[in-house]
A protein has these predicted regions:
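N-terminal catalytic or cofactor-binding beta/alpha core of small enzyme domains
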Residues: 1-104, 109-133
Length: 133
């Protein structure tokens, strides 16, 4: 199967939002990655960014929607209370002190090359700020 081949060869997925298979690839890869890495701790979704910086509002916009519909995870970061470079460490400390062994999913925008505009990337592991991980 194509998806299984992609997953076993690469530990991350990059797909353009305009691809006709983007939704299916994203969902399948996300579920597979979550199944392989989830530690059974409380689920925390960290939506990183700010609408005060051009190109950095993805996290807070997603967080705004997730706050309304997400019942099984604690969501940090939205338009009213963004999580960004200035307060990220403080928010992470709060998460670590509030939840025992949290499983954190991060949603963040990345500025990069023009040919990567519209590309979604899913990868296990930590975000590495300012290096386009």
């Amino acid at each position: 199967m194509l998806f299984e081949d992609i997953y076993t060869k690469h530990r991350d997925l990059r797909v353009h939002i305009d691809s006709p298979v983007a939704y299916n690839m994203f969902c399948n890869y996300f579920v597979k990655t979550l199944a392989d890495t989830y530690n059974e701790g409380p689920l925390v979704i960290m939506c990183i960014g700010t609408d005060r910086s051009t190109g950095d509002a993805l996290g807070p916009l997603v967080g705004e929607r997730l706050h309304k519909v997400c019942k099984y995870a604690k969501v940090f970061g939205n338009l009213e209370e963004p999580v960004h470079a200035v307060n990220l460490e403080k928010v992470l400390d709060k998460v670590q002190s509030t939840y025992k062994n949290p499983f954190i999913i991060a949603i963040d925008a990345s500025l990069g090359r023009s040919e990567n505009v519209g590309t979604i990337k899913i990868a296990p592991g930590a975000l590495k700020p300012e290096i386009g991980r």
